[in-house]
Structure formats: structure tokens, C-alpha cells
């Protein structure tokens, strides 16, 4: 397999599962996480299934060829030019569709009026808000893609999970993250590639799309969040901190920028949930960055706090596994993560090492329900449980 084509088998199987259904498949995720490669792998799969090449239409709206397609009228013209005369099903693979204003109506018309199978990708969470949701009324399925998991990282390196190299490679993964192009690059180039990814997200996906002319405040917010991963924050706290550092701003501006950072999939928000009161606390939340490599690139040596990096890896992996994730509060005690999926609830504490005072497991023991509770550690221990709570080394957990 070429360096550019790291297999994303889990995501590919999700696409295949919905092939030839009425659902529009929406692949969403941060820039450079592998959405386009996944489209290419789906195209290869279709051809292997005997679908004729002329019945597969790939359109990339970031490419030079389609720069003229600005709105729904242009999009309709393009479809009329490209649509085969075949009576067979046409497979549309449409990359970075958010660059076309009003694309929703055209995609819905394709779904309704023609024999089609449609996959679209986008690097903005607003893709699935407002008009698309109304027009399609539940006729789409979202496939959320992230940078490589540690399992995928090892697979890309052709290293077995039982290899002695695993711990060494975890250190590389934890340092440089899981963006496919970074993973496959030689070490001297990794930093340069991360810099390019960071700039393209900040300048193209956030500042340019939202019309942010002065990026200084935006970058200051990013640096603050990256430096405070896993800390409870709110717009007022961020605004006051930046203002004290001679970056004058307002709560309103901070709130707007937080939304932009979430929409670009650069940061994910974990709301604080009161376990006893069974409700969300509105004041504070934690923010986690999509990739540890980007975090380290953004804040440099300040990012040496291993506990924060560990917590970030666990949070993103929980999202990758399909959980919705909150941070928990039980009276004065903090639960790092409450992860929910269908009827399942998982309580997670994260610690570099097992503290002598068993503080981390004590917090879990105070939760009086029967859902699973685990402690994920940054150091390896022979010990596998404390008072009935599973203790697992982060590398082993990532490889489950």
C-alpha cells in the first residue's frame, strides 16, 4: 500500500454497509484526516464489485478543475455536463462540498430524481446543520473520521501489536499524533507537515470561511485551549486571561471563536455533567484538541504536561469508538469522562500513575450504579484492578 493510501478499514466498512441505500453518506472530520483517501478506497471497492468507471463520478471542489463552481446554479450545470446517459445507478463521490453555496438542494435533487448512491465529505460541522437536515429529514448517515488511532498507526507502520516496538512507537504517536501524512513522513519532515496542517485549518477552514480578518485573537484562543487541555474553562475565563496578557477581547468574541474551532473539528467540547443532579452544568466545559501532534506544534515545549496529553488521547479515542463524552462531577469529586453509547455508560479516570492515596479510584467508587468503571494509566502496572475497578495501561487500552 502506498504512503498516501493508508487503509481505513473501519470507516470503509461503514460506507459499504450503507451502499445502495437511500441514505446520503456524509464523511465529516478535520482537514487532512483522510476523507479524500477514504473516498478513493470506496471508489476502488466499487470497481472491484464490477461498477463501471463511467458510472462513478468523483468531484473534488478543492481542485483547480472545479474552482468555477461557486453556487447551486454552477453545481447544477456541472451535474448536467458530467451525468452519464447510463440507465444504471450512478455513484457520486463529492469531496469538500462546503465550498459550494447552496449545494444542499442539488444533492437532494440528485437523491430524489435519479438512481444514485451519494457520498459527500466536508471539513465543517455546519455541513449537517440547518438546511441539509431539513431537506433530507433523516435521510443521511454521518461517518465521523479522525486522525489515525494507535491501532491504525501500527498497521500503517506494519508493526504487530505484540511487537517489542509498540511502546517506542506509542511515544512517537503520542508526540507527533496520527495525521496520515505525518505518520508516514520521515522525522525531519513531520514538524513541517504539522505546521502546514495547522495553518490550513486556522487560515482556510476557520479564518477565511468565517471572515476573521485579524487572526491574532483567534490564534491566542487556540494556544490557550491547547495549553489548557483537560481544564475547566468558560468564555469569561478565556477573555480575562487573554486581556491580562494584552490581547484585549470580549466574551462574545471568545464564544464565537469557540464555535468556529468546534465547527472545524479542531477542538471538541466536553460539557460538565452533574451525576447526582442528573443534569448539565452550564458554567464550565473542557476542550480537547483533535490531535496531540497539533497541540505540541501549537504550544511547543509548554506542552510537556504528560497528564494533559494522556487525557487528550483517551478523550479522542472514546469519540473514535462512537461514544459521546462528558466530564463528570459528583459533589466535590471529578470524574474525568462519562462515555455514553446507546444503553452503555462507561466511567473513566485517567492518571499517569496510580496515586498512593487511591484518589482516582475512590472517585469512581462513589458512583453508586453498576456501569463499568476503569482507570487508564500512563505507566504499566502488573496490577489489573483496585477494589473491583479495572486498571489498564493506556497502550493496552488503545489496542483493545
From Swiss-Prot:
It comes from the Bacteria. To M.jannaschii MJ1544 and MJ1637. This is Uncharacterized protein HI_1038. It comes from Haemophilus influenzae (strain ATCC 51907 / DSM 11121 / KW20 / Rd).
Amino acid at each position: 500500500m502506498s504512503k498516501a493510501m493508508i487503509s481505513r478499514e473501519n470507516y470503509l466498512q461503514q460506507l459499504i454497509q450503507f451502499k445502495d441505500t437511500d441514505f446520503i453518506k456524509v464523511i465529516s472530520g478535520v482537514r487532512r484526516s483522510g476523507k479524500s483517501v477514504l473516498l478513493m478506497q470506496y471508489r476502488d471497492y466499487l470497481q472491484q464489485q464490477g461498477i463501471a468507471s463511467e458510472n462513478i463520478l468523483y468531484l473534488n471542489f478543492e481542485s483547480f478543475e472545479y474552482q468555477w463552481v461557486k453556487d447551486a446554479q454552477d453545481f447544477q450545470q456541472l451535474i448536467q455536463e458530467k451525468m452519464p446517459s447510463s440507465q444504471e445507478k450512478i455513484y457520486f463521490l463529492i469531496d469538500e462540498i462546503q465550498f459550494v453555496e447552496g449545494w444542499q438542494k442539488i444533492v437532494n435533487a440528485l437523491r430524489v430524481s435519479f438512481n444514485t448512491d451519494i457520498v459527500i465529505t466536508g471539513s465543517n460541522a455546519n455541513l449537517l446543520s440547518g438546511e441539509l437536515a431539513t431537506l433530507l429529514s433523516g435521510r443521511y448517515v454521518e461517518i465521523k473520521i479522525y486522525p489515525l488511532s494507535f491501532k491504525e498507526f501500527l498497521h500503517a507502520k506494519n508493526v504487530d501489536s505484540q511487537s517489542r516496538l509498540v511502546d517506542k512507537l506509542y511515544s512517537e504517536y503520542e508526540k507527533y499524533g496520527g495525521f496520515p501524512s505525518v505518520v508516514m513522513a520521515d522525522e525531519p519532515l513531520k514538524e513541517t507537515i504539522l505546521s502546514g496542517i495547522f495553518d490550513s485549518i486556522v487560515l482556510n477552514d476557520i479564518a477565511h470561511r468565517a471572515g476573521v480578518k485579524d487572526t491574532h485573537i483567534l490564534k491566542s484562543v487556540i494556544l490557550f485551549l491547547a495549553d489548557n487541555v483537560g481544564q475547566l474553562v468558560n468564555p469569561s475565563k478565556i477573555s480575562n486571561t487573554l486581556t491580562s496578557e494584552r490581547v484585549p477581547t470580549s466574551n462574545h468574541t471568545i464564544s464565537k471563536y469557540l464555535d468556529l474551532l468546534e465547527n472545524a473539528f479542531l477542538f471538541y467540547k466536553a460539557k460538565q455533567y452533574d451525576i447526582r443532579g442528573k443534569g448539565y452544568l452550564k458554567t464550565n466545559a473542557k476542550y480537547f484538541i483533535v490531535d496531540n501532534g497539533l497541540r505540541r506544534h501549537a504550544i511547543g515545549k509548554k506542552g510537556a504536561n504528560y497528564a494533559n496529553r494522556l487525557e487528550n488521547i483517551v478523550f479522542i479515542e472514546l469519540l473514535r469508538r462512537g461514544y459521546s463524552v462528558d466530564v463528570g462531577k459528583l459533589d466535590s469529586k471529578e470524574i474525568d469522562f462519562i462515555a455514553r453509547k446507546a444503553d452503555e455508560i462507561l466511567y473513566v479516570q485517567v492518571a499517569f500513575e496510580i496515586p498512593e492515596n487511591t484518589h482516582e479510584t475512590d472517585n469512581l467508587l462513589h458512583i453508586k450504579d453498576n456501569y463499568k468503571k476503569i482507570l487508564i494509566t500512563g505507566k504499566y502496572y502488573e496490577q489489573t484492578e483496585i477494589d473491583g475497578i479495572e486498571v489498564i495501561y493506556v497502550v493496552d487500552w488503545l489496542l483493545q
